[in-house]
């Protein structure tokens, strides 16, 4: 386990067309800290939003290689968590914490 606080684990909600579609199936998508584990993500969502989490799936999106003024740079990697909530529960990510 790492020493991350609940607010440090969840970086931001992901609001895309795909995340809107999965929200119909009691799922919410968050950008999370790279070091965060699935149990830490589950504990943070349950503590911050007061909901019951049934599953957490994670994926790491690798950063793209970009060119700026002739120099090659690289964007940071982003860890994304798809959190499945218990039946009948929801999170309104548009209002914030």
Swiss-Prot record:
The keyword Ribonucleoprotein appears for this protein: yes
GO CC, any one term: ribonucleoprotein complex
Gene Ontology terms describing biological process: translation
Matches recorded under Pfam families: Ribosomal_L23
One Gene Ontology MF term: rRNA binding
The keyword Transcription appears for this protein: no
The organism's place on the tree of life at top rank: Bacteria
Keywords per UniProt: Ribonucleoprotein, Ribosomal protein, RNA-binding, rRNA-binding
Assembly and interaction partners: Part of the 50S ribosomal subunit. Contacts protein L29, and trigger factor when it is bound to the ribosome.
Function (record text): One of the early assembly proteins it binds 23S rRNA. One of the proteins that surrounds the polypeptide exit tunnel on the outside of the ribosome. Forms the main docking site for trigger factor binding to the ribosome.
The family this protein is said to belong to: Belongs to the universal ribosomal protein uL23 family.
Name assigned to this protein: Large ribosomal subunit protein uL23
UniProt source species: Brucella abortus (strain 2308)
Source taxonomy: Bacteria, Pseudomonadati, Pseudomonadota, Alphaproteobacteria, Hyphomicrobiales
Record gene name: rplW
